[in-house]
Amino acid sequence: MSTEQVGAEITSIEELKSYIGKETSVGDWFLITQEMVNKFADATGDHQFIHVDPERAKQTFFGGTIAHGFFTLSATGMFSRDASGVRVRLAGSKMGVNYGLDRVRFISPVPVGKRVRVRRKLIGVEEAPDKRWVQMKNETTVEVEGNDRPAMIAETLTRAYF
């Protein structure tokens, strides 16, 4: 990411479109704890041992507990809350919402006790015919510190409503 992007604020749709194909943010490293994974397991009912039983998980090829793939996906907002990069604040926008996901892949595990971060690259911008919303498509990548392969890659869709 170029230094001129860091801290920039996008206020117009035309300016937003100029970022298509560019990395727009990189989050700070974020530690994944067993407590977080356990709370996610409790919230979802997914208590598979590879997530919640450190002793048993040590016996697997993972070598310990790992975060749920859906925890990794759902926590991307938390992982990127202190991200450096551009901020999208379109003039007149009343709210932003998650609209959906395309092409989600969990490529490698997220071991408990490791740090992760999120990278986002804007890959598309679509305007509603009636100008009620603007949709942004980002390539969202979760990286595990020290790993060459990402943990997750997804195309995330968000909308700004006017």
At which residue positions do the language-model features occur?
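Short alpha-helix capping/helix-loop boundary micro-motifs
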Residues: L101-F106
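HotDog/MaoC-like acyl-thioester-processing domains
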Residues: M1-Y19, S108-F162
